[in-house]
């Protein structure tokens, strides 16, 4: 636990993350009795805290905190943890681990708003339902780089750990955020993305691209902005969540090698399309609709031609229209800015809004039924005009396509009429399709924008998918979502419980396998395995006559009673019908299968789709352009369709994407975050125990903690452990001898003072218990700190000793000087000493004069030699200038060539990538070829059968040929007859279709009765079985128990055997996987090393050889395909002959059908009569409704009159009040009488229903007779349908073969072109590579020559050093310059060669890219052809669906006619009663009005919670308003008592009025709901205002934080500059010390020689003045020589080092390439074996299924529903309190923002002032030190001048001049050689440039040829399409002629 000071870095988030120091101390000092403090089970709260009173006989008596005394069993009593574990951050550290401890820890942390808690290896988060300040920028920086144990639990800590694992382990990571709907997954996903975008920023702005519009932000901005856009179009309000994700997404964030953001992409899964057109009452549609209508941007309202009222649009107003927690106006601005940041163009932005508005208008399209027809027609065109305008269509064409779509029948298109229901269904399907495709297109555009093409190495994936859902109405979408969650939970269980324990076994650790009972395979297999739910659904979709009922029956047959997870639900009143139930891990869900077949097939109106494709809105045309665009649109759904499938259903596509997701997750290292819902009412701070416990059990939280505590969650390889932790005890591992890593790790751990039971040694790794690795890290940090402090102490001691030695030397030298000075001062005034000073110079004056003369002569000679040397030097300088100019020119050329070589290297990398892609494509092609071969084999078998049949038919053909001449003469006459017959056939087909529909309706009714009968029989059988079982149960229990024991023993034996086999298989697989992992690690290391290498020429040669081999293989494959094409052509000709024979057979069958049609004419007449009667009844019904409306209008008028009269008579109300009170009791009695009369009416109604049932039985008998009559017709239609399907199948096969032939021919042409181009490219590449290899060899040869010359020059330099001895060494300076120039030129030429090679490679890659583009165009053609075939099948299915809908419509019409008949009977009775009681009807109507007005007052009474007495008093007050009518009412009462018959009539009227009153009550309830929603809306507006303020403050704080970050960066730069200046200062001080040492040495030498030179110096002063200038020049030359000598040494070292590194790199490159190839082959074989073993393991695991826990009790839900009303009031109060609190927080935040701004300004000023002053001080200090250095150098020069005044110096100078002449001649020769080499290099560079020009011309030529090839391909494609059309026309003509 960290202190409060350490938590200060988290700012205001600290109290929400960790307990304070004070709380921790209080918890430790809190009194606690471990024996008596317990949790006990409680029926209401699940568990409560209690104190044990006594323990007796296995039972415990305890007293709860509430004061109640309870007695429970021992197993229901759980010990409490000590107080120091309260609010513990990692629940795995608790002493007592059980459900109540985990529950109360989460509850106490949640009460303190600590929403994140570690649970072993993963994190648990509880939804706070409010905003918490734990996601600020300062929190992000605080978590950056922190270990898990160093910081409190947080989603940022999980994210940072994943980021650090990715960098250290070099492995892809994934973060799985799971939980039920409304648990907070989406919010946590956004926080993870925010964290990565903050810590891994690139800081680079994207370049502006012409295709995608202006760029508005960096990559991290775009990643963050993708969320608001996707949420606007993909999130909606549900019952459990205001911002529920209605689609799944997997966000991959890619990072470069340095850990910076490189790119990102998003994969989406299963958008809930049905929400576009339908919402439940408590839900609403997607946010974007309501954002647009929020009127934040009025220009959008005008552009989309819409209003701001959502209730004006049917598609978006079926549920709620506002959400309290969402500000639609603010969200609209966020969505709009996200569109701009993500680079959408203005046209794309407008088209997005237009298509969204068009979807809203689609919901308002109205259609009506034509009079006396079933055909639909538009009911007004205003809405259609708006929708068509927004979609760029013609409204007339749109309406025509909807009402009269064109359907393909055979080879012709037919216009088909649609009913109103069919048109509405088509409109809904189109709206959903437009919205879905637009959403997928937006995801694809976002991915395109986020793909920066930067190099990327690893990624972190974040999964946010819709949570587990249990609604009242659960459909196909909920099944897919729940299945996904089931798979993810299974992945979690497998990763946490199975793989973990398998690794222990594999590593040889002693471990007993623990079965946690968390296997979900049974439910998963029930859904996805063969003959599972999805399989049966897809099978039913393939049958055109399949219905929801047949689908349900198949499910029951296959799974009911056979699978424990599949059940038949019990009907519940008030809830929608459910057809089957599945027991999921999170509970039992009831599913309704209505419309699943249509949802799965997802049919569309093809005529409207054709209009969309021609739309003027480019985006809409792109969305529906075909499969090529659809594939591109499909967001994260990479890859096309599976081969061989004509179309793909929604469930198949969903499963394919889910399998891809699971594959991605298995290839990563997962990190789990479990989101928990605390309560169902979205109340902040409240936690429902049972709900949380259920989620903890389902999610495996307790099991995860247990395996974390029992197991070894941390592990590390032995070599890594030895390398990292060797520092803890280096003496444990002996130096100088090799020791195995495992043994070294064992010795190291054995020598450390830790608990040795906390770790285990495996075969390859050492395993640690939880927390031990953190302890080792702390020990390592402490040890490193000790070592560093010791090193620093030793360095400081050494420096102190050196300084002390210097001080001692200075002291001795000072003493020496003082002694000599004192001695001289004592003797200088002696007379003899003065005489000595005078005589001493005179003694040697003569000698000195001679010496001076000689020296003058020598001086003149040296002057002449110096002048000559100067002249030569000038000549050499001129030559050097010329050479420098040439060198600069060469450098420019070499630089250009280096650039080209760099380009060539990049192309080489791209070639490797394209090679891998080509290999993958070749594999796909081979697989397709194998499939085609299988299909070909099947076709050949069919062909042989057909040939046999043809041989039989040929005999008949011979006979027919004889009669053919006669038939041709009668052809013209028969053609007319045939036309008439075809028309009659069409009519008969329609009648047959109608009859079949009626028959199906009858069959369904019959089936329903059979089902009911079967259900009743099942109930009887179950009752009898239960009875017999209960009777036999007592007798059989003992026997069954013994049998169960035996069976259990047998099962345990079999289980042990299977476990042994499983373990063996698992061990073998784990060994293989371990080897694979090691190989992968080695491979990754080698790849990382290879990425840093520069030269890849040898790899290119190997690639070229492999490509040649592949080309040869492809050529052979093409030849085989050509042979197959020829065989297919021959089979096609035979098949055409067979098709003509079949068409003749069809004609014969049609003639038979015509004969059979006569038998059904009587039935047709009966049907016509029934239809006429039906139309008559419908007209009567319409007339009755008109009469009803007229009477209602008259009654309304009377009501208005009575209201006016009552208004005038208000004054009389007071007088008649007493009378009304008397009549109150009388009216109560009347009401009782009316109730009794109602009971009699209900009995009469029951009798009528019995009569209806008898009539229905008679009708069923008639239907059975009709079925017998139609059986013959059905047989004939079945034969005809079979023959038609066979003919269609043959025609489809022929079309497929045609397309296959054309495709193969195009593929052949493309391959031949590619082969020729690749041959040319290979030849050019081989030539270029040979030239480059030759150039490389010559360069190496030149390097060898230079190395030899360099060695010779070293010897010469040594001679010069010995000879010169600090003389004039300018010649050496020239020599070193020439050497460095030569080395630089060789390096520059090598770089130029590399650039040329890179340029060549770029050209080749471009050619390959163009070839790939051609191949992709061919693929798109093929996909288009497949899509056309799919669309044809979809059309047939839509026709079948339309027929089914027609059948349903007719059944409904029949039911309506029956009810109409009943209505007419009751209407006749009503008219009879009205005649008898017309005199009383007006009075009763007034009474009814008074009663209705009393019900109107009911709303206010309910709000005020008044009782029944108040309601009755209000009723009497309303009746009192009748005024003058009271006396008439008394008369009415008397007449009612007298006339009993009239009372019965009045009772019927009263029944109708009561029904009306019930409607009024419903309206009142609706109004109450509206008031409630209005209150919620106001609360939401307040919340939105508060959220807005919060967001504003957060933005301000974020801006302040960014400014602070910038200031921190500037301060860091200043510190870096300061450090650099300090380094320079240290160097200057070192130079100063060196100069001081030189000065001290000079002084010592000076003292030694001073005594000798005293006599001669006086005489030589005058003579040497002329030589001082020359000596100063010599000193300068010596300094230059020393500097040049140092440079030579450095250059020599660098040259040798680079040469060695180059050779090593080349050798490593060769080794790595060979290893890569070897590892690749091994890896492929290992993958294949792994797949086989995985399938075996999955089969073995399938035999060990466990029972899934049961779901929540329904009683708890009922209790929660009862308490909802009370909770609403409490929520209102809490929200008011929170709003006041947030208002105060707002003011505090504003004040803090101002303070922060003020502090920031002060910090900026201080930083600027402090930085400038410090820099100025450092610069002044540097200048002072430079001055000191210069002064010391001057002193040193003066000292050298004194030392060099000796006679031998002149002789040495003469000797040196002679040696210089020789060296100059030698250097002259060297210069000539270097010039010749430079010329040779120039020639090579010119040749390389010519070669690059030739390659560029070839590239342009190839590019031109490629463009011509593309044009030819387009022309050929158009010709093929024309020929196809012609062939179809010819085919139709042939059929019509036959």
Curated annotation (Swiss-Prot):
Which parts of the sequence carry Phosphothreonine? 64, 69, 419, 1240, 1254, 1285, 1466, 1500, 1516, 1729, 1735
Modification type Pros-methylhistidine: residues: 756
Domain Myosin N-terminal SH3-like, chain residue ranges per copy: 33-82
Which residues are in the Myosin motor domain? 86-781
Q: Where is the IQ domain?
A: 784-813
Query: What are the start and end residues of every segment in region (Actin-binding)?
Result: 658-680, 760-774
Sorted UniProt keywords = Actin-binding, ATP-binding, Calmodulin-binding, Coiled coil, Cytoplasm, Hearing, Methylation, Motor protein, Muscle protein, Myosin, Nucleotide-binding, Phosphoprotein, Thick filament
Cited Pfam families: Myosin_head (PF00063), Myosin_N (PF02736), Myosin_tail_1 (PF01576)
Q: Could you tell me which residues belong to the region Disordered?
A: 1124-1146, 1152-1171
Q: Which GO terms describe its molecular function?
A: actin filament binding; ATP binding; calmodulin binding; cytoskeletal motor activity
**UniProt subunit comment:** Muscle myosin is a hexameric protein that consists of 2 heavy chain subunits (MHC), 2 alkali light chain subunits (MLC) and 2 regulatory light chain subunits (MLC-2). Interacts with SLC26A5.
Q: What is this protein called?
A: Myosin-1
Q: Which gene encodes it?
A: MYH1
């Amino acid at each position: 636990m960290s202190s409060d000071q350490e938590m200060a870095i988290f700012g205001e988030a600290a109290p929400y993350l960790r307990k304070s120091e004070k709380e921790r101390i209080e918890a430790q000092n809190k009194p606690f009795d471990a024996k008596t403090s317990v949790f006990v089970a409680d029926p209401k709260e699940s568990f409560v805290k209690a104190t044990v009173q006594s323990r007796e006989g296995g039972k415990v008596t305890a007293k709860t905190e509430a004061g109640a005394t309870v007695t429970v069993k021992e197993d229901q009593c759980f010990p409490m943890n000590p107080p120091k574990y309260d609010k513990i951050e990692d629940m795995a550290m608790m002493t007592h681990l059980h459900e109540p401890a985990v529950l109360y820890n989460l509850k106490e942390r949640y009460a303190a708003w600590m929403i994140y808690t570690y649970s072993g290896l993963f994190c648990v988060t509880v939804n706070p339902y409010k905003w918490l300040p734990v996601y600020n920028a300062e929190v992000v920086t605080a978590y950056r780089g922190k270990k898990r144990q160093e910081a409190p639990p947080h989603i940022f800590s999980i994210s940072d750990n994943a980021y650090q694992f990715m960098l250290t382990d070099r492995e892809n990571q994934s973060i799985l955020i799971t939980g039920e709907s409304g648990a907070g997954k989406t919010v946590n996903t956004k926080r993870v993305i925010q964290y990565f975008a903050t810590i891994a920023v690139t800081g680079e702005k994207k370049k502006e691209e012409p295709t995608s519009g202006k760029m508005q932000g960096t990559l991290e901005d775009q990643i963050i902005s993708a969320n608001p856009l996707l949420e606007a179009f993909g999130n909606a309000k549900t019952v459990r969540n205001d911002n529920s994700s209605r689609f799944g997404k997997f966000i991959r964030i890619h990072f470069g090698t340095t850990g910076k953001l490189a790119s990102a992409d998003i994969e989406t899964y299963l958008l809930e399309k049905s929400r576009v057109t339908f919402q439940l009452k408590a839900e609403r549609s997607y946010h974007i609709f309501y954002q647009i209508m929020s009127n934040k941007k009025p220009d959008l309202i005008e552009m989309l031609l819409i209003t701001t009222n959502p209730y004006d649009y049917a598609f978006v107003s079926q549920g709620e229209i506002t959400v309290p927690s969402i500000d639609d106006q603010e969200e609209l601005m966020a969505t709009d800015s996200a569109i701009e940041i993500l680079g959408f163009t203005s046209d794309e932005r407008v088209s997005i809004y237009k298509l969204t508005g068009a979807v809203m208008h689609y919901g308002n399209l109205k259609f009506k039924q034509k009079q006396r027809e079933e055909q639909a027609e538009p009911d007004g065109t205003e809405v259609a005009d708006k929708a068509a305008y927004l979609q760029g269509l013609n409204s007339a064409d749109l309406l025509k396509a909807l009402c009269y779509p064109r359907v393909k029948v055979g080879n012709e298109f037919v216009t088909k009429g649609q009913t109103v229901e069919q048109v509405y269904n088509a409109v809904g399907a189109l709206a959903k399709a437009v919205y879905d495709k637009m959403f997928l297109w937006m995801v694809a555009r976002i991915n395109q924008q986020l793909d920066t093409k930067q190099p990327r190495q690893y990624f972190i994936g974040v999964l946010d998918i819709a949570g587990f859902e249990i609604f009242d109405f659960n459909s196909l979408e909920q099944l897919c979502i729940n299945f996904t969650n089931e798979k993810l939970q299974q992945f979690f269980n497998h990763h946490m419980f199975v793989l973990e324990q398998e690794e222990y076994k594999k590593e040889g650790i002693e471990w007993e396998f623990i079965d946690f009972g968390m296997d979900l395979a049974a439910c998963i297999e029930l859904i996805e395995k063969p003959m599972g739910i999805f399989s049966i659904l897809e099978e039913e979709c393939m049958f055109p006559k399949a219905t929801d009922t047949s689908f349900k029956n198949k499910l029951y047959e296959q799974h009911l009673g056979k699978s424990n997870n599949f059940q038949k639900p019990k009907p519940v009143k008030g809830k929608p019908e459910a057809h089957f139930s599945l027991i999921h891990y999170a509970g039992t869900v009831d599913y309704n299968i209505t419309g699943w077949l249509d949802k799965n097939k997802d049919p569309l109106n093809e005529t409207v789709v054709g209009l969309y494709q021609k739309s003027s809105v480019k985006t809409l045309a792109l969305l529906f352009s075909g499969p090529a665009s659809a594939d591109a649109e499909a967001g994260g759904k990479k890859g096309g369709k599976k081969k061989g499938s004509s179309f793909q259903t929604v469930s198949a596509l969903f499963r394919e994407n889910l399998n891809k997701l699971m594959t991605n997750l298995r290839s990563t290292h997962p990190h789990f975050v479990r989101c928990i819902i605390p309560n169902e009412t979205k109340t902040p701070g409240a936690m429902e125990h049972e709900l949380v416990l259920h989620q903890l059990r389902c999610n495996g939280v307790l099991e995860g903690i247990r395996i974390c505590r029992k197991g070894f969650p941390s592990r590390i390889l032995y070599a890594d452990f030895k390398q990292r932790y060797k520092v803890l005890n280096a003496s444990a591992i002996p130096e100088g001898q090799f020791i195995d890593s495992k043994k070294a790790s064992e010795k190291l751990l054995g020598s450390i003072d830790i608990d040795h039971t906390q770790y285990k040694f495996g075969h390859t790794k050492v395993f640690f218990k939880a927390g031990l690795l953190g302890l080792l890290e702390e020990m390592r940090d402490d040890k490193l700190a000790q070592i560093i402090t010791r090193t620093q102490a030793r360095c400081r001691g050494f420096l102190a000793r050196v300084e002390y030695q210097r001080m001692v030397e200075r002291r001795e030298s000072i003493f020496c000087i003082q002694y000599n000075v004192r001695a001289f001062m004592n003797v200088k005034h002696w007379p003899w000493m003065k005489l000595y000073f005078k005589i001493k110079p005179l003694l040697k004056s003569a000698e000195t004069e001679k010496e001076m003369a000689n020296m003058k002569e020598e001086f003149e000679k040296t002057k002449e030699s110096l002048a000559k040397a100067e002249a030569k030097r000038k000549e050499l300088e001129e030559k050097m200038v010329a050479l420098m100019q040439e060198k600069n020119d060469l450098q420019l050329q070499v630089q250009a060539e280096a650039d080209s070589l760099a380009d060539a290297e990049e192309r080489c990398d791209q070639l490797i990538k394209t090679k891998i892609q080509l290999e993958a494509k070749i594999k796909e092609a081979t697989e397709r070829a194998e499939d085609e071969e299988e299909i070909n084999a099947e076709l050949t078998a069919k062909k042989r059968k057909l040939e046999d049949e043809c041989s039989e038919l040929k005999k008949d053909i011979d006979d027919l040929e004889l009669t053919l001449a006669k038939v041709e003469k009668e052809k013209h006459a028969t053609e007319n007859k045939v036309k008439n017959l075809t028309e009659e056939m069409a009519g008969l087909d329609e009648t047959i279709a109608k009859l079949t529909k009626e028959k199906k309706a009858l069959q369904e009714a019959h089936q329903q009765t059979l089902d009911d009968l079967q259900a009743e029989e099942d109930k009887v059988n179950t009752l009898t079985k239960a009875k017999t079982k209960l009777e036999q149960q007592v007798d059989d229990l003992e026997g069954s128990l013994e049998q169960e024991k035996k069976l259990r023993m047998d099962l345990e034996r079999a289980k042990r055997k299977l476990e042994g086999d499983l373990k063996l298989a698992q061990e073998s697989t784990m060994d293989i996987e371990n080897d694979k992992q090691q190989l992968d690690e080695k491979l990754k290391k080698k790849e990382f090393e290879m990425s840093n290498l520069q030269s890849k020429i040898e790899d290119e040669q190997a690639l070229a050889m492999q490509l040649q081999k592949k080309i040869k293989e492809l050529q052979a494959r093409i030849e085989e395909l050509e042979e197959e094409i020829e065989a297919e052509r021959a089979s096609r000709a035979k098949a055409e002959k067979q098709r003509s024979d079949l068409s003749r057979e069809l004609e014969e069958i049609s003639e038979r059908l015509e004969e059979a049609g006569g038998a059904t004419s009587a039935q047709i007449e009966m049907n016509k009569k029934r239809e006429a009667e039906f139309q008559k009844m419908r007209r009567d019904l319409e007339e009755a409704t008109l009469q009803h409306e007229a009477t209602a209008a008259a009654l309304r008028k009377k009501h208005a009159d009575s209201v006016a009269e009552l208004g005038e008579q208000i004054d009389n109300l007071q007088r008649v009040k007493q009378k009304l009170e008397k009549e109150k009791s009388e009216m109560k009695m009347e009401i009782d009488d009316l109730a009794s009369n109602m009971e009699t009416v209900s009995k009469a109604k029951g009798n009528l229903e019995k009569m209806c049932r008898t009539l229905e039985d008679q009708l069923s008998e008639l239907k059975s007779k009709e079925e017998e009559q139609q059986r013959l017709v059905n047989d004939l239609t079945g034969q005809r349908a079979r023959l038609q399907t066979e003919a269609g199948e043959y025609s489809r096969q022929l079309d497929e073969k045609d397309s296959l032939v054309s495709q193969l021919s195009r593929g052949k042409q493309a391959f031949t072109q590619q082969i020729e181009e690749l041959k040319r490219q290979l030849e050019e590449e081989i030539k270029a590579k040979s030239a480059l290899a030759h150039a490389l060899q010559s360069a190496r040869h030149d390097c060898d020559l230079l190395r030899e010359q360099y060695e010779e020059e070293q010897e010469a330099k040594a001679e010069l050093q010995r000879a010169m001895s600090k003389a004039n060494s300018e010649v050496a300076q020239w020599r070193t310059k020439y050497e460095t120039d030569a080395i630089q030129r060789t390096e520059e030429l090598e770089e130029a060669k590399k650039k040329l090679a890179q340029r060549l490679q770029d050209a080749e890659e471009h050619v390959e890219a163009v070839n790939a583009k051609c191949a992709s165009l061919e693929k798109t053609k093929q996909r288009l052809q497949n899509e056309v075939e799919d669309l044809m099948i979809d059309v047939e299915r839509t026709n079948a669906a339309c027929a089914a809908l027609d059948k349903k419509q007719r059944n409904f019409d029949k039911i309506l006619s029956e009810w109409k008949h009943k209505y007419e009977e009751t209407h006749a009775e009503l008219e009879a009663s009205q005649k008898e009681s017309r005199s009383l009807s007006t009075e009763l109507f007034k009474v009814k009005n008074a009663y209705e007005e009393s019900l109107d007052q009911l709303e206010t009474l309910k709000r005020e919670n008044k009782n029944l007495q108040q309601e009755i008093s209000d009723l009497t007050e309303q009746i009192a308003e009748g005024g003058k009518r009271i006396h008439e009412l008394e008369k009415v009462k008397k007449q009612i008592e007298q006339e009993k018959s009239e009372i019965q009539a009045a009772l019927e009227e009263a029944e109708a009025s009561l029904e009306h009153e019930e409607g009024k009550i419903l309206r009142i309830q609706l109004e109450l709901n509206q008031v409630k929603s209005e209150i919620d809306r106001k609360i939401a507006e307040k919340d939105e205002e508060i959220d807005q303020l919060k967001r504003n403050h957060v933005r301000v704080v974020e801006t302040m934080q960014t400014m602070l970050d910038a200031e921190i960066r500037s301060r860091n730069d200043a510190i870096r500059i300061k450090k650099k200046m300090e380094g320079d200062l240290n160097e200057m001080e070192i130079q100063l010390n060196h100069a001081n040492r030189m000065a001290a040495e000079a002084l010592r030498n000076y003292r030694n020689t001073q005594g000798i030179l005293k006599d001669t110096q006086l005489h030589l002063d005058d003579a040497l003045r002329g030589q001082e200038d020359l000596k100063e020049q010599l000193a300068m030359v010596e300094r230059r020589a020393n500097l040049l000598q140092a440079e030579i040494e450095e250059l020599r070292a660098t040259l040798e080092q680079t040469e060695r590194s180059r050779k090593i790199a080349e050798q490593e490159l060769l080794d790595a390439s060979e290893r890569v190839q070897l590892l690749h082959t091994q890896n492929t074989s290992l993958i294949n074996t792994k797949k086989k073993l995985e399938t075996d393991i999955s089969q073995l695991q399938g035999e060990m299924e466990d029972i899934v826990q049961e779901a929540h009790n329904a009683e708890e839900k009922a209790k929660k529903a009862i308490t909802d009303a009370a909770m609403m009031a409490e929520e209102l109060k809490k929200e008011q309190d929170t709003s006041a609190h947030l208002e105060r927080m707002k003011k505090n935040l504003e004040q803090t923002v101002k303070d922060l701004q003020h502090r920031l300004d002060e910090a900026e000023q201080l930083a600027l002032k402090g930085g400038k002053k410090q820099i100025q001080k450092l610069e002044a200090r540097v200048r002072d030190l430079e001055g000191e250095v210069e002064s010391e150098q001057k002193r040193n020069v003066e000292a050298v001048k004194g030392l060099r005044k000796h006679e031998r110096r002149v002789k040495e100078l003469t000797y040196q001049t002679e040696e210089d002449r020789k060296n100059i001649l030698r250097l002259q020769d060297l210069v000539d050689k270097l010039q010749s080499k430079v010329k040779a290099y120039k020639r090579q560079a010119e040749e390389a440039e010519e070669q690059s020009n030739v390659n560029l011309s070839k590239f342009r030529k190839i590019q031109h040829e490629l463009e011509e090839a593309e044009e030819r391909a387009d022309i050929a494609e158009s010709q093929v399409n024309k020929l196809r059309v012609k062939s179809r026309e010819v085919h139709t003509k042939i059929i019509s002629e036959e």
